Amino acid sequence: KELAAFVGKDEALCFSTGFTVNSGVIPALTDRNDYIICDDRDHASIVDGRRLSFSQQLKYKHNDMADLEKQLQKCNPDSVKLIIVDGVFSMEGDLANLPEIVRLKHKYNATIMVDEAHGLGVFGKQGRGVCDHFGLTHEIDLIMGTFSKSLASIGGFIAADSSIINWLRHNARTYIFSASNTP
């Protein structure tokens, strides 16, 4: 509860690593009729998570919001559209254009998941991440984070509303079939 409150969400679910968060959460949230839309420079754990899903996968050019919109236009309007983006891109060090991604979320009825692995502890008030930095925490559906960067520990988490966390608790295979975190 404290971790979820820190990043501005109802609940959080802890995993053994940050990598297992993305590789388990992404396939648990989508199925064959859904779309995953990712920045082409997203972290390897996001790439593997989308590969493990059976959803239709679309990539947009790095931080190119016109291309993101072009990819969203390809989606069936009645299907789930999950936009997944790094808050801070680990190789480039630049920030996702969250204000524009949120605008497109509303225009195309999409869901947003932000990987805060490199933003947590650095950006936002008291290190709450890039979502907080832009004042958009309430607009972001899922916030992922890791303990292995600024928090200097082991493990990862996903934070969202209670219904999403409950779904993931019972459907994210990397949570169900993995070892628990170290104390």
Predicted regions and their residues:
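Conserved Walker B
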Residues: R41, V88, A117-H118
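Active-site phosphate-binding strand-loop segment of PLP-dependent enzymes
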Residues: L58, H62-V114
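Short loop-beta-helix segment that forms the pyridoxal 5′-phosphate
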Residues: K1-G24
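Short, structured coil segments at secondary-structure junctions
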Residues: R32, L52-F54, Y108, E139
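Conserved PLP-anchoring active-site segment centered on the Schiff-base-forming lysine
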Residues: V25-A44
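Catalytic P-loop NTPase motifs of RecA-like helicase/translocase cores
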Residues: A44, M91, L120-G121
